[in-house]
Regions:
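N-terminal redox-cofactor-binding region of secreted/periplasmic oxidoreductases
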Residues: 1-623
Length: 623
């Protein structure tokens, strides 16, 4: 690409926000430059710390069961080390805390991000779960913009989805009857992954049946609906369940095509192939700042051309990169995510004066960029089973060439078509809550959060069962992203200010997570009595009181859905963006990614970001 070349739109970042938006703008007839700091994960060579010298790509990208390894593949991973607490004494209680990594001071907890084409859709667990209607209605009330209400927003899910896990509903939709309001012709395929071999694993079947029966009773769901799990009716994305029956046992749809990962990468490349004259994808391009004229109009971006330039990269380069510029005839749209979009804005002079001026940056527009950072709290209830291995995992090494891999590669069958989740339950932590706030799901493996090497630990012992608990709708809005330095290759400083350090002074979040642990213990009580579970290793039977469980949650909780750091809302109320994604105090500059939400939506962030990107494309093309 020629330095200074002009396009209608420049989109920065190719994840769920940027990749989706760039493709839709190009389909709408606009010329688009999509800038991505990383490379194409299916064309790179990459390994992980436990298997040096062995290239695990493209399998780490493609194979659903390898999703943990994808997040630690050094060709595409960006390692952020974040603080959960400002207090060193509190932070160091977390066993995931690292003072140093690879000899470099990091002083935090690993927070895996993906610096690659497709962004975090290249390494996530592919779970596609619809947000709550109240999430959209809340934005509509905050902004006075009715186009954000839940009824209006559903069209964007229908536009992007190509549902393949409701065959009967698909037939009805072809006849013009679509009460589920799934999408059937969108670009993102969704599937249900239930390996047939699971039915032959009697230990697993008993675990699933006993856990499901207890969960049905606990949430007040008729046990007769257990068959819905088999018949694909326990669908968390069905419009009727979203609006009328939000609690219960569910399966977890995955964003896969023919049981291989599908995400923003596929959307971008397939659109670029159809419209090469409209969509230009520039890889290995690290954006350093937005360029403006004298009237705060965005005119383009400055970026560094070169591989592995960002210091979060798994193999950061020591070269400086080539400084280039690109011009936008219409708009610049930042889609770098909840960490990198605030960083780019602040390096461009848009942010808190208290952050910019001490670093010698001129304040162009003073806005609370980087404030309001939110995430979900997650913890694991980890069990060692009373047998050597799950039968379904026999012979599985999670490497290319084993029997399970051949089943996946040759026939798209077997355990590797799944991300490891086998059952989920949605519930309220307290009966009086207006919305469900807990998503509890069972995983075959040992998973207690993120630390260097976690992906190998998760699958190393084939006789573990982890119930992961996600706490939605946090009360804590005290997280913050700030600049470490004026060097765009440095990572920002990130502090989530967990629990009592944050804004949840009443302790509602902590109480809710403890309620989730007690729910899981009710599900597993029969499994323990029947001798299937040998031991609850974490939190462990020694922790029984509320205070003991709260201490466990405080010291081990994690998150991986960072959002809300450039929220939509009135400027005088702490908002950074207008309801049409424009940055307050500027022209021709928008943000479209997970940072735009005033409050973190639903249980899993990616479906909401995809929807936001589709809405943004509609807004931009309509204007």
């Amino acid at each position: 690409m020629n330095d200074g070349e002009a396009f209608d739109y420049i989109v920065v970042g190719s994840g769920a926000g940027g990749g989706t938006l760039a493709a839709r703008l190009a389909e709408g007839g606009q010329s688009v430059l999509l800038l991505e700091a990383g490379g194409d994960p299916r064309l790179l060579s990459g390994t992980n710390d436990d298997q040096p010298g062995i290239n695990r790509l493209p399998d780490d990208y493609d194979v659903p069961a390898f999703q943990g390894f994808a997040s630690e593949n050094d060709a595409m991973r960006w390692d952020f080390f974040v603080r959960h607490y400002a207090s060193d004494a509190m932070q160091e209680k977390d066993p995931k805390y690292r003072r140093y990594y690879r000899g470099v001071p990091v002083n935090g907890i690993l927070y895996p991000r993906a610096g690659t084409l497709g962004g975090c859709t290249a390494h996530n667990a592919m779970i596609l779960v619809y947000p709550h209607n109240a999430d959209w209605d809340g934005i509509a009330r905050l902004t006075g913009d009715s186009s954000w209400n839940a009824e209006a927003m559903r069209q964007y899910f229908e536009r992007l989805e190509n549902c393949h896990h409701r065959p009967l509903e698909r037939v009805l939709a072809a006849a013009g009857v679509n009460p589920s309001r799934h999408g059937w012709h969108g670009w993102l395929q969704s599937e249900k992954a239930v390996p047939a071999a699971a039915l032959g694993d009697f230990g697993l079947v008993q675990v699933l049946l006993d856990s499901a029966a207890e969960a049905f009773e606990d949430v007040g769901q008729p046990i007769e609906q257990l068959l819905d799990l088999v018949e694909a009716k326990a669908d968390p994305n069905d419009w009727r369940l979203v609006t009328e029956n939000a609690v219960g046992v569910r399966y977890t749809p995955l964003a896969t095509r023919n049981h291989a990962r599908m995400g923003a990468r596929e959307r971008v490349l397939e659109t670029a192939e159809k419209h090469p004259d409209r969509l230009r994808v520039e890889l290995h391009a690290l954006v350093t700042r937005v360029l403006f004229d004298d009237h705060n109009r965005a005119t383009g971006v400055e970026y560094l051309k070169g591989e592995r330039l960002y210091r979060a990269h798994g193999q950061p380069s020591t070269t400086e990169g080539e400084l280039r510029q690109a011009q936008a005839a219409r708009e610049v749209i930042l889609c770098g995510g909840a960490f990198n979009t605030p960083q780019i804005l602040m390096l461009s002079g848009i942010g808190p004066r208290t952050v910019l001026e001490p670093l010698g940056l001129q304040v162009r527009v003073e806005l609370p960029v980087g404030k309001n950072l939110q995430d979900r709290y997650e913890v694991g209830v980890i069990h060692r089973m009373n047998f050597d291995h799950w039968n379904i995992l026999e012979g599985a090494t999670f490497n290319r060439g084993d029997r399970a891999y051949r089943e996946w590669a040759d026939r798209r069958e077997g355990v590797y078509i799944s991300n490891g989740a086998v059952l989920a339950a949605i519930l309220k932590s307290r009966a009086e809550r207006p919305l469900p706030d807990l998503f509890c799901f069972a995983l075959l493996g040992l998973f207690g959060g993120y630390f260097p090497g976690y992906s190998s630990v998760t699958v190393a012992k084939p006789n573990y069962l982890t119930w992961a608990i996600l706490k939605a709708h946090t009360q804590n809005r005290a997280g913050e992203v700030t600049l470490r330095s004026v060097d765009p290759r440095d990572t920002p400083l990130i502090d989530f200010n967990y629990f009592e350090e944050g804004s949840d002074v009443a302790g509602e979040d902590l109480d809710s997570v403890v309620a989730g642990i007690r729910f899981v213990r009710r599900l597993t009580a029969k499994l323990k009595a029947d001798g299937l579970i040998a031991e609850e290793e974490q939190p462990g039977d020694a922790r029984q009181t509320d205070e003991e469980l709260k201490d466990y949650v405080r010291t081990t909780a994690w998150g991986h859905h960072a959002s809300c750091s450039c929220p939509i809302g009135p400027r005088d109320g702490g908002g950074v963006l207008s309801s049409d994604f424009r940055v307050h105090g500027t022209e021709r500059l928008r943000v479209v990614d997970a940072s735009v939400f005033p409050n973190i939506p639903g249980f899993f962030i990616v479906s909401a970001v995809y929807m936001v990107a589709e809405k943004a494309a509609n807004v931009i093309l309509s204007s």
